[in-house]
């Protein structure tokens, strides 16, 4: 292994040469307390920045083993270190000068959710830490400006590494609180199901966000307060006794007037599948980890999905046991979203009336009298909701503000009244007796068919070059084919979208074989990631710093929206 002095000498030798001379710097260098790896050098100063990584031996980093002895603690620790490294690195970015991206330092900017990322990892066997980031190697025009790179790597970077990646130099109390919070959150998650619950919202939680494009908490808002009938408590290892609203398994209806907080509560539950940082307000909003938001998605593609549970006898004679379309309607898209969620082993559906297809959710009495059952291809969700719970163990939480039909099948009815939840189950059930359901549930339907098998991506293998490009949080493209994820609403971070793009590529090129069904492929992928790490799915020789761990549910959602599946 080369020493840092070797790198210093090399930089002197290549100064003012053509930019391509930077390629000779690739390798790993010993900086005494850490190792710097130059993993990939950009082709010119205007190209994507160079890829670098820092490696600190566990005995030097000095983090207590009790802070990374479980997976969830490792994620919390690495998330915190990434935030610290980002704070210090952003202060020195562009202090070195030059053309193009010269002087840039860049690393993942974490949001409110705590996610596993390729940016920072820790080896649980010895505490070794690796951090991956980007840097723009300085140039004058298109010639090497080695003096400025020397400034970046020897003058600026060492202090960033020292102040953020060594236990003795960081705020130890703050880190301790991060680890303790992760333990408390994990305690609730692991006991939620055994308590008969699908979600928990702690008293005092702050659910609304400051605006429509921010995930930061709204100041001076009404804090969450559980109704007595739904209040449960958890004894946490560090927080102690905590109380809040436990939403039981079964069918829960959330009602209330407009702007009273129904959708805000549901949105918090959607993201409750992730841990949140201290101060977010949703630290103890915990949802079943398999929960899926279900909505209408006009225009999406559907490939060989069995939607016959909800759609049958189409006038064009189209087969709904293996349904295909490039342009789904509201009802067929929502039917597909339900069945595909079942395929992912989801045990909780989250549904908002505002984003649902009305004809998929209900058929009122007058419509049933005018358009007879044998003339209607759609079996509405209301007729399947009890079967989904009693037969498949899938609970539902539904937000409704204009339709009272779901009072009948609901087990629990909660009214949001000026942002405060109230238990109105008895009152609502009594009122519903005066409006009996005319629609009778159909006989039980055969289990949906989940044997969809897809061939390897031969069309991709024929391509001379395969390019995956992330298009913000809501989409990615593989060559010229865009995968639209706008309505996969539980993606929390752009780096998850990037990971989904590489995951889809990996499954098409390495796992799909025409024999394994889609769920088996997804399970195999998740097992590979669990065993070998998220960076396994990359197509490069170096670890990219821009991947965040998605759930199996989003992995399969991305697969299902790929139009060349």
Residue spans for each PLM region:
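Flexible beta-alpha connector loops of hexameric P-loop NTPases
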Residues: 300, 310-331, 363-378
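Terminal-proximal interaction/regulatory segments of ATP-powered molecular machines
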Residues: 484-565
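Carboxylate/His-rich catalytic cores and anion/metal-binding grooves
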Residues: 193-199, 203, 259, 266-297, ...
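N-terminal pre-Walker A segment at the start of P-loop NTPase domains
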Residues: 208-243, 278, 286-291, 295-302, ...
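N-terminal accessory targeting/assembly segments
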Residues: 1-187, 191-196, 207
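Conserved P-loop NTPase
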Residues: 416-497
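Glycine-rich phosphate-binding P-loop
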Residues: 242-274
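Conserved P-loop NTPase nucleotide-binding/switch module
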Residues: 341-385, 389, 402-408, 412-429
């Amino acid at each position: 292994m080369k020493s840092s002095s070797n790198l210093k000498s090399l930089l002197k030798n290549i100064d003012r040469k053509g930019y391509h001379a930077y390629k000779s710097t690739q390798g790993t260098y010993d900086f005494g307390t850490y190792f710097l790896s130059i993993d990939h050098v950009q082709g010119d100063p205007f190209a994507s920045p160079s890829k670098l990584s820092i490696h600190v031996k566990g005995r030097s980093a000095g983090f207590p083993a009790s802070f990374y002895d479980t997976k969830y603690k490792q994620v919390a620790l690495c998330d915190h270190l990434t935030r610290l490294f980002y704070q210090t690195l952003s202060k020195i970015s562009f202090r070195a000068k030059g053309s193009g991206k010269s002087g840039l330092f860049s690393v993942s900017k974490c949001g409110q959710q705590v996610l596993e990322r390729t940016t920072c990892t820790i080896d649980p066997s010895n505490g070794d830490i690796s951090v991956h980031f980007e840097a723009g190697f300085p140039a004058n025009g298109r010639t090497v400006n080695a003096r400025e790179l020397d400034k970046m790597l020897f003058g600026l970077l060492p202090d960033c590494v020292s102040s953020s990646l060594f236990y003795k130099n960081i705020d130890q109390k703050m880190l301790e609180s991060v680890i303790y919070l992760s333990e408390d959150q994990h305690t609730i998650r692991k006991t939620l199901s055994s308590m008969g619950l699908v979600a928990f919202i702690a008293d005092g939680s702050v659910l609304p966000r400051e605006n429509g494009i921010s995930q930061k908490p709204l100041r001076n808002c009404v804090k969450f307060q559980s109704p007595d009938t739904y209040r449960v408590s958890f004894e946490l290892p560090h927080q102690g006794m905590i109380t809040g609203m436990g939403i039981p398994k079964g069918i829960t209806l959330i009602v209330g007037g407009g702007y009273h907080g129904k959708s805000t509560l549901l949105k918090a539950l959607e993201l409750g599948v992730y841990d949140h940082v201290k101060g977010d307000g949703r630290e103890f909003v915990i949802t079943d980890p398999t929960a899926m938001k279900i909505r209408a998605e006009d225009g999406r593609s559907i490939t060989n999905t069995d939607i016959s549970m909800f759609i049958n006898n189409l006038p064009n004679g189209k087969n709904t046991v293996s349904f295909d379309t490039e342009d789904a309607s509201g009802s067929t898209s929502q039917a597909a979203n339900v069945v595909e969620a079942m395929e992912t082993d989801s045990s909780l559906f989250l549904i908002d009336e505002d984003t649902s297809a009305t004809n998929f959710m209900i058929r009122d009495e007058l419509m049933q009298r005018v358009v007879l059952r044998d003339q209607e291809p759609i079996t509405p969700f209301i007729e399947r909701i009890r079967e989904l719970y009693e037969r498949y163990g899938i609970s539902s939480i539904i937000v409704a503000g204009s339709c009272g039909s779901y009072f009948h099948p609901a087990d629990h009815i909660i009214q949001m009244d000026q942002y405060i939840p109230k238990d109105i189950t008895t009152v609502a059930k009594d009122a519903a007796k005066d409006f009996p359901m005319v629609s009778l549930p159909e006989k039980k339907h055969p289990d949906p068919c989940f044997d969809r098998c897809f061939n390897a991506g031969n069309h991709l293998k024929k391509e001379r070059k395969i390019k995956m490009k992330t298009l913000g949080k809501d989409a990615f493209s593989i060559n010229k084919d865009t995968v639209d994820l706008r309505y996969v609403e539980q993606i929390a971070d752009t780096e998850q979208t990037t990971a989904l793009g590489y995951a889809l590529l990996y499954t098409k090129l390495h796992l799909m074989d025409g024999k394994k069904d889609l769920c088996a492929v997804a399970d195999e992928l998740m097992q590979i990631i669990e065993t070998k790490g998220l960076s396994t799915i990359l197509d490069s020789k170096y670890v990219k710093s821009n991947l965040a761990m998605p759930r199996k549910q989003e992995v399969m959602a991305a697969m299902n929206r790929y139009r060349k599946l």
